[in-house]
Amino acid sequence: MAFAHHAEAAQSSIVSGSAPGFAAGVTGGGDATPVYPTTIDELKEYLTSSSPQNIVIEGTFDFVGSEGTKTYQACNIYDCTPDNGGQAILNTLGGCGDTSTYDVTIDVAGYQGINVASDKTLVGKGTGAVLNGKGLRFVGVSNIIIQNIEITNLNPKYVWGGDALTFSDTNQIWIDHVTTSSLGRQHYSFGQESDNAITISNSFINGKTDYSATCDGHTYWGLELVGSSDQITFYKNYVYYTSGRSPALSGNTLFHAVNSVWADNSGHAIEGTDNGMGLFEGNVFNNVPTIVQSGFVGQLFSSESANLSQCETSLGRDCVTNAYTSSGSFSYDDDGFFVDFENLPIVSAASASSIASTVPSDAGNTLSST
C-alpha cells in the first residue's frame, strides 16, 4: 500500500517526547483538537474514524462482556490445563489435531482488537489508563502514536484468545510506555506483510500470568515477528517473566534492540526461523539462562568488546556492549545485514549499567504527568 507523508503536521502537545529510532517523525493526530472519550463506544468511534484524532483517556475502559461471548472447541495439549495454571488452545486453526476437544466460552471483545485507523494518537492520562479486555490492531495504516496505557485480560486461559497489539502492512507507528499483561496469546504480533518504521519504547511486557503454556507462571507468547521486511526499534523496554518468543525473530525482520532489560526468563528469549536479523546493544540480561534457542537460523550481532567497531560504517558509531547477570552466553557477530541500517534513523545507546535499574522502574504506563 502507499502511505501518505506526514512531515508537515506537528505532533500534538498531549504526547510526551518524540519517537526514537525507526519511527522518528511520526505525528499521529497532528494538530487535531484533543478529544476525551468516556465510554468504550466513543473510544472505538474515535480510533476508527477517518479523520486525524488526538485521543486522551483516563481510568479503565472495560470491554469485557461488551460484545457478548462465543463458544469454541478447545483442547489441552500442554502438560497443564487452565485448572492448574496452564492454557488450553482454541481449535480455530486446527491446532488440536487428533487431541480430544471440548466446548469453552470466550469473551468476544478480547478475541480481536480495535482496528485503529491512520493518523491517530491515543494517550493515557495519569498512570491508570487501561483497556480491559480489548487489544489494538494496525492493519494497512500509518502514522499512529500509542502512549501510556495498559492492555490486559484478553481471554488469558486460551491460546488464540487475544493479542494485545497486532501489526500488518503498516508504516510509522510508535508504541511508548505501554504495559501488556494477562493475554491469551502475543503481547506483540507482527504479521507477514511488511511493517516499516516501527518503534516500541519504554514499554513493559509483563509475562507473569496465572495461565502459562509452559506451566510455570511465565508466558511463552512475547513478540512474534514474521514480517516480510519489518523495521523495528526496540528501545528501553522491560521484558519480564517470559519463557519464549522474546522475540521470535523470523521473516525478514530488522530488529534493533537497545538499552532494554530481559529478566527472569524460564525457557529462552530469542528464537526464530528464516532470515530474522537482530542487533542487540546496551541491553541487560538478568536471570536468562538461555538467551538464544538452539537452532536459531537468522543473523544476530551481540556487541562483544572485540567487535564494537563493526557498527561504525552503518550506525555512525561503535556499538555498546550488553551486560549479563546469571544468564547464558550470547556471542554472535553476524554483520552482513548492517547495510540495512543505512539511511534509517538510529537511536543512541547508553551503557547497559546506566539503564539496568531505570528501565524496569520506568517502563510501562508510568507517565503521571500526561
UniProtKB/Swiss-Prot annotation:
One of its GO terms (molecular function) is pectate lyase activity. It catalyses: Eliminative cleavage of (1->4)-alpha-D-galacturonan methyl ester to give oligosaccharides with 4-deoxy-6-O-methyl-alpha-D-galact-4-enuronosyl groups at their non-reducing ends. Glycans are attached at residue 307. Its EC number is 4.2.2.10. GO terms for cellular component: extracellular region. Disulfide bonds join 75-96, 311-319. It is found in: Secreted. One of its GO terms (biological process) is pectin catabolic process. The keyword Glycoprotein applies. The active site is at residue 245. It holds the Pfam family Pectate_lyase_4. Keywords: Carbohydrate metabolism, Cell wall biogenesis/degradation, Disulfide bond, Glycoprotein, Lyase, Polysaccharide degradation, Secreted, Signal. Pectinolytic enzymes consist of four classes of enzymes: pectin lyase, polygalacturonase, pectin methylesterase and rhamnogalacturonase. Among pectinolytic enzymes, pectin lyase is the most important in depolymerization of pectin, since it cleaves internal glycosidic bonds of highly methylated pectins. Belongs to the polysaccharide lyase 1 family. This is Probable pectin lyase E. It comes from Aspergillus niger.
